């Protein structure tokens, strides 16, 4: 049943690498680094065979293996069935108050591909990127496994 991957539709915006480089230098120096995740069920790991096989934990594991000298803290604020509208309303309490150094956001499957979710997603990005702790922010877009659809077009607009 799979759906072909349309690499032509995929979008990559490298943006400014300053914050991620600073975060990695902090880890290289052996300083503590907090790695946070915000999203829906994919982030929560609801279809993973174990909590250790969800993408968020695997990214955390990469940080631990890449920077063994640093104390890496894992903060998974994924809640299944939620959208960026709920994400922007809870990001402060569930993630930002913990002062993460690195944040990965994923709502591409639960957000609809329309202007409303473009606005709520943009609000979420502005809130996380504009936080006083200046975290590195990485945005990820997955696709639905049943039909290959995501909100990537709106999120990238």
Where are these regions (language model features)?
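Residue-level recognition of beta-strand->loop/alpha-helix junctions
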Residues: 76-78, 108, 141
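N-terminal secretory targeting modules
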Residues: 1-37, 43-50, 60-70, 97, ...
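A short helix->loop->beta-strand "cap" motif at the edges of active sites that frequently abuts
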Residues: 129-138
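Charged helix-capping and loop-helix junction motifs
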Residues: 117-124, 152-155
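Mobile, glycine- and charge-enriched loop segments
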Residues: 51-85
């Amino acid at each position: 049943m799979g759906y072909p991957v349309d690499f032509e539709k995929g979008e990559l915006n490298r943006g400014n690498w300053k914050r991620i480089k600073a975060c990695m230098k902090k880890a290289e120096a052996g300083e503590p680094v907090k790695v946070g995740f915000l999203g829906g069920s994919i982030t929560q790991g609801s279809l993973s065979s174990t909590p250790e096989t969800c993408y968020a934990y695997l990214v955390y594991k990469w940080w631990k293996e890449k920077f063994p000298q640093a104390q890496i803290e894992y903060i998974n604020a994924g809640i299944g069935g939620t959208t960026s509208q709920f994400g922007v309303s809870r990001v402060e309490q569930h993630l930002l108050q913990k002062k993460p150094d690195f944040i990965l956001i994923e709502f591409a499957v639960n957000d609809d591909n329309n202007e409303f979710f473009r606005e709520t997603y943009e609000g979420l990005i502005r809130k996380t990127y504009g936080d006083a702790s200046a975290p590195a922010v990485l945005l990820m877009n997955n696709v639905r496994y049943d039909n290959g659809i995501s909100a990537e077009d709106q999120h990238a607009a």
